UniProtKB/Swiss-Prot annotation:
Cellular compartment(s): Cytoplasm
Subunit structure: Monomer.
A GO BP entry: arginyl-tRNA aminoacylation
Keywords: Aminoacyl-tRNA synthetase, ATP-binding, Cytoplasm, Ligase, Nucleotide-binding, Protein biosynthesis
Organism placement in taxonomy: Bacteria, Bacillati, Bacillota, Bacilli, Lactobacillales
Gene source species: Streptococcus thermophilus (strain ATCC BAA-491 / LMD-9)
Protein's name in the database: Arginine--tRNA ligase
Any GO MF annotation of the entry: arginine-tRNA ligase activity
GO cellular component, one term: cytoplasm
Superkingdom as given in the UniProt entry: Bacteria
Amino acid sequence: MNTKELIAAEIAKVVPELEQENIQNLLEIPKNADMGDLAFPAFSLAKVLRKAPQMIAADIAEKIDASNFEKVEAVGPYINIFLDKSKISADVLGQVIAQGSHYADQNIGNGRNIAFDMSSPNIAKPFSIGHLRSTVIADALANIVAKQGYKPVRINHLGDWGKQFGMLIVAYKKWGSEEAVKANPINELLQLYVRINAEAEEDPSVDEEAREWFRKLEAGDEEATALWQWFRDESLVEFNRLYDELGVSFDSYNGEAFYNDKMDEVVDILTEKGLLQESQGAQVVNLEKYGIEHPALIKKSDGATLYITRDLAAALYRKRTYDFAKAIYVVGNEQSAHFKQLKAVLKEMGYNWSDDMTHVAFGLVTKNGKKLSTRKGNVILLEPTIAEAVNRAQAQIEAKNPNLPNKEAIAHAVGVGAIKFYDLKTDRMNGYDFDLDAMVSFEGETGPYVQYAHARIQSILRKADFTPSADATYSLNDVESWEIIKLLQDFPRIINRASDNFEPSIVAKFAISLAQAFNKYYAHTRILDESPERDSRLALCYATATVLKEALRLLGVEAPDEM
């Protein structure tokens, strides 16, 4: 139970007319520390109790059980509560030390599945910073819900089907080399794709040839299928190398192609339920009653199924396979109309579990204020970006700590962590401008800043040769340590807020605040000096490092012990 919950519970005993949650929401932090740590305004009770707020405040202050607090006093219409800092710090430090990385674990999820549709790069196209957002936001949310007791299922819905494969097959048969593709799959396939598109602009017969090869692929032609499978496999080898660098793994790589034989069932159900209407030769589902102006296009006039039909098949398959409590689609903001249609069609089909599906949208990454585009060449590729970030991290580590062992591994943790943290500290609906210098800086609100605070604490603990005892009671009541204690106590609430809002930036901002509070404490306090508080100060360091490391882990960022 955190401080606000404790206060609300005590006030609710005296004033049963108010719900505990309402009391919690009314609690304020006084502007002046002399007025207590938290204050409860009695105005809202005046109508209910038919008394002046000043009298109500005096009554509550007199009747409340103050044994958990330093003191409780009424000042005008406010009940001012002074917390027992020594007691609270002992409780919080005791919990963190006893539970370690499991501090703030919960069982809200009760082992139920949450399916994450995430990352989803296109086969034979390079993995760009644009794909990074979906990957790291979803991975962090998956870690956060796992801490709440859910079981995340990470699904990489690969872009592994479509007419572009007809183009690729034509290009490969004209100019391709097995050796070149194996040596550098994505780059080689991209070059072939760009070259064939340029030729198609000059020669319309190329388009027809590509369409013919895609028709063969759809019909299961042996040569077309073998080439498609090979392009997919080679691309996946390269993607997996990048995912390994990012420290991200998946439970399923079922992409678009996986649902080829599952779309007929969707069309059959829609037909059976009388939901399909004809519109200019195409088959559509009208969604006006959901306030959606444009109908969902299920089948084109030539009988070809569409993107939404595939997503409907995927939703049905995932519900049957994983029986998810929630399905989270971490996909760019520009897809919001598509997901509204998807949920509405499922609702029309009678699947009320569509209410458990959420589109977690995010803003764009820009470069120098301009939108990124593979076609226009304004693209930031992930692989060279990681390499550059690691090099810059290594240069800073060399300058700060030239004799550090495992420099390469630490530079990798810092470089990759810097890119991920910068993305995750941004409110997901906001985009950000890509700036590698800002990302890899050890100053400011960055991943390396938080990692360095953790490494600094580990250095202090090594110097002191300190391991906390489970039997000891550690408590502090100075101003600087209190700022840290309040943050540590708030960690369980932070996790719930991040999960409820699908917002990893809440955890990233918490990690920054905790690192800043510790650095302030470090500047004001002689931690290692012999004094009666020495062990309690070291216990505070230990607890701070534990929670910093866990917050970073939730974001998919490593916390090196040395930097």
